[in-house]
Amino acid sequence: DDGLLEVAVDTSAGELIQSWATGATVVKTFNTVSYHIIADPSIAKGLVTIPLASNDAEAKARVAAVVESIGMEPFDAGPLRFSRALEHMSTLHMVPYLQDRWEDAYEFYFVTGTAPLGATGVRLAK
């Protein structure tokens, strides 16, 4: 087995939870970073940006405050349906562990403010 997880449904766990708990508010976060980085962000040797996906702006702001309180930077990744992408990132992150290649494990982080300043900095691919 190469470690790639099969997708059972065409949705995300965040969206499934929201559909099952209709009165609840779901904010998808912390699944793109390992537990040991959450416990001690200084291990990352730089700012750790944590994406948040939710349909509720107020709930997302409350969770963003929690992210900031532990020394990380919240990043608004959009509505809850974007948790699909975040969950796939989590799967990619787990591949070395699922293949029993712990020595090849890695972390990845979002870096904001890196886009070109305008359309002049972008060219079409040929």
Identify the role of each PLM range.
Residues 1-42, 59:
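Rossmann-fold NAD(P)-binding glycine/threonine-rich loop
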Residues 48-126:
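Active-site-lining helix/loop region of Rossmann-like oxidoreductase modules
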